[in-house]
Regions:
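Exposed, low-complexity/repetitive linear segments and helix-based recognition motifs
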Residues: 2, 13-17, 113
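Cyclophilin-like peptidyl-prolyl cis-trans isomerases
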Residues: 34-213
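Aromatic (phenylalanine/tyrosine) cluster motif
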Residues: 4, 9-11, 40
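Cysteine-centered motifs
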Residues: 21-22
């Protein structure tokens, strides 16, 4: 999700939003394919995000939709990458974004992956409905790394432009709570929204390391 898109939620027109965002950096957003897997099966990976306050969110990942994106997310989780990171950008009625190691929205894992979405030539029909997980990127389509966002509300203008790869199955109330927290002028929560521990259950399936750009 870019700053330009989020600005549309705060300004009277796209022109106003673009004028404001031209002075800002875009945030990071991205991607892989396992054949023969039925969509939405119990064998799909399940991610558990435990917040610092004890709240729990669970999400199902869809490797048959965005295989390299899922491989990347699982790889980072298994390395403990997300433990202690925050949701640094929160927009009520839109989405919550996290996964930046610096907590600024400008950091990443030190590499990029290919964007698995239709505008980048990759078939991905998963819509950005409430609870869907998707990868953040910069302007370049192949610039996703570790930052991801969870949809607070359905946002069809993102469909085909970002690599959606999973969906919240438990704890949407936690997403709502984070989305409704007070933020500053840059959409940063005033009270840090910390992911204490992020784990993944792969049900015995070994997922490969992601292909990097």
């Amino acid at each position: 999700v870019s700053l330009y898109e989020s600005a549309l939620f705060r300004y009277n027109s796209a022109v106003e939003a673009a004028d404001d965002c031209c002075h800002s950096r875009l945030l990071l957003i991205s991607p892989a394919r396992i054949q023969g897997r039925k969509r939405y099966t119990m064998s799909n990976p399940i991610v558990t995000i435990e917040m610092e306050n004890g709240d729990i969110m669970k999400a199902e990942l869809y490797p048959e939709i965005a295989p390299n994106t899922v491989n990347n997310f699982i790889s980072l989780i298994q390395k403990g990458y997300y433990d202690g990171l925050i949701f640094h950008r929160v927009i009520n009625g839109f989405m919550i974004q996290g996964g930046c190691p610096d907590g600024t929205g400008m950091g990443g894992p030190g590499y990029d992956i290919k964007g698995e979405f239709s505008q980048n030539g990759f078939k991905n029909d998963l819509k950005h409905t409430e609870g869907v997980l998707s990868m953040a990127r910069a302007m370049h389509p192949d610039s996703a790394g570790s930052q991801f966002f969870i949809m607070h509300k359905t946002s069809p203008h993102l469909d085909g432009a970002y690599a959606a790869f999973g969906k919240i199955t438990e704890g949407m109330d936690v997403v709502n709570k984070i989305a409704e927290t007070a933020t500053d002028y840059s959409d940063r929560p005033l009270a840090p929204q910390v992911m204490k521990k992020v784990t993944v259950e792969t049900f015995g399936v070994e997922y490969p390391e992601p292909e990097k750009c």
